[in-house]
Amino acid sequence: MAQLGGAANRAPTASLAPTSQSLRCAPQPRPSRADTGSLGRYWGKAAAAASREHPFPGTLMHSAAGSGRRRGALRELLGLQRAAPAGWLSEERAEELGGPSGPGSSRLCLEPREHAWILAAAEGRYEVLRELLEAEPELLLRGDPITGYSVLHWLAKHGRHEELILVHDFALRRGLRLDVSAPGSGGLTPLHLAALQGHDMVIKVLVGALGADATRRDHSGHRACHYLRPDAPWRLRELSGAEEWEMESGSGCTNLNNNSSGTTAWRAASAVGATAVETSRRVAASRTKAKDTAGSRVAQMHSLFRHLFPSFQDR
């Protein structure tokens, strides 16, 4: 009986030991379909959101930093720290190391001071420009990212010849290299804009005092002298880059500036003169035609009389 009891006690112990056959026959746990579907929908939505975040490379860098933080928060909520794509981890690691304005990054957004500088330059407010330059002198080299105009372009456009001299002297004192003939949108230099707006003193300051290059051409191949008004003096044309043969032949007087009131009046007078000449020519032609018609009728009558009356003599 003791042996039977011992055998009975050993039998359950042996049955509890796992065997290869029992492992194969045991049911394996299956992943929940609901979990798989939710994860699939999550990754699909995350990929769609990532594709919509940056439709083109010029998107501001603030959205990139915010998207990285949002992705990290989503993974923390869903417990997917280990299942994040490698691309997301690399982007967030780069943001942590360098940030949107770190070394080697292409920061495209404007700082508040840069934004204020561009607005003040476009409006020609020198007092605001001077305060900003005292705080950050490097703003002098900052141009408008849309038009490509520097502060010299805007001052020349507004006719601020004294402010041009002050800005140039400030650049010399601070050791900043300021290009007086730098091209902007369309290849226009500050000298081109001064000629377009009819600011004679600005032209004299740019060429005579600041050493602007009067031979620079815009993208249409025109120098600043081609945008002067028709009644501009010859000395001003010479400063604006007109050559001797242009001044002698009079071709330098050709004005391409549509904003000039003198050009508009000259074109209107030319149009009126051309209309008057055309009207006179038509009247003279009609009179000549009438005379020819009358002469032909008289000749026909004379020939008729000669046939009817042979004794009729042409007198």
From Swiss-Prot:
SMART domains: ANK
Keyword Nucleotide-binding: no
Keyword Repeat (UniProt): yes
PROSITE patterns: ANK_REP_REGION, ANK_REPEAT
Assigned keywords, A-Z: ANK repeat, Repeat
Highest rank taxon of the organism: Eukaryota
Gene3D superfamilies in alphabetical order: Ankyrin repeat-containing domain (1.25.40.20)
Transmembrane segments: none
Pfam families associated with the record: Ank_2 (PF12796)
Annotated spans, Disordered: 1-39
ANK repeat ranges per the UniProt record: 112-141, 147-162, 186-216
Family affiliation: Belongs to the SOWAH family.
The protein, known as: Ankyrin repeat domain-containing protein SOWAHD
Organism, scientific name: Homo sapiens
Gene behind this protein: SOWAHD
